[in-house]
Amino acid sequence: VEIPVAESLGVSRTPVRLAFRALEQEGLLEKAGKRGYVVRRFSEADVRSAIEVRGTLEGLAARHLAERGMTDAVRETLAGCIAEGAAVLAKGFLVDEDIGRWGRLNKRFHDALVDAQDSRVIADAIARNNHLPFASADSLALDRAALPSEYQKLRIAQLQHQLVFDALTQRESARVE
């Protein structure tokens, strides 16, 4: 596997081998005996677990942030994301462009929360987990054919963002977690 990849990229086997090892450590590739690597299969349960792990780690990050307190810049970023989310939902329905917009604002919200807390260990664990399929905050599994029901999901997510922001503002660490 290394040789064809190296040839197609015009590089030696060494960087390809190192990249494959890194992808294996991230859980995206698995060793296939002496034949190299195969792409790891992920079940629906794996995806659910990865999302649950992200939620738990982000809850811990939010607790740390609530205990320490938010800077004005973090407060403004989170409030801006909430305002943008409200604007997306204000018309009472979704269009295709709203999905990408929501994904970007959701990523900004979650990234701001994680970046502002004080634990590099938590941030690193979240970053590793985010490499798994559909685990990151910008991975939205929305059904474009059922936008009315997806609208309701985003309304709930918007409410959750508001509740997290309120708890952070009031420095209620147990509530935010």
Give the positions of each predicted feature:
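Short linear motifs at protein or domain termini
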Residues: 1-68, 73, 121
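Residue-level recognition of short, well-ordered coil/turn positions
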Residues: 28, 69, 93, 172-173
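C-terminal regulatory/effector modules of DNA-binding transcriptional regulators
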Residues: 146-177
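Amphipathic, non-transmembrane alpha-helical scaffold segments
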Residues: 51-54, 102-106, 154
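Conserved amphipathic alpha-helical segments that form helical-bundle/coiled-coil interaction surfaces
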Residues: 72-143, 160-163, 175-177
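Amphipathic alpha-helical repeat elements characteristic of tetratricopeptide repeat
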Residues: 55, 79, 155-159
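Surface-exposed charged/polar residues within alpha-helices that form helix-capping/stabilizing sites
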Residues: 49, 63, 115, 165-166
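A ubiquitous short alpha-helical element
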Residues: 44-48, 66-72, 92-97, 144-153
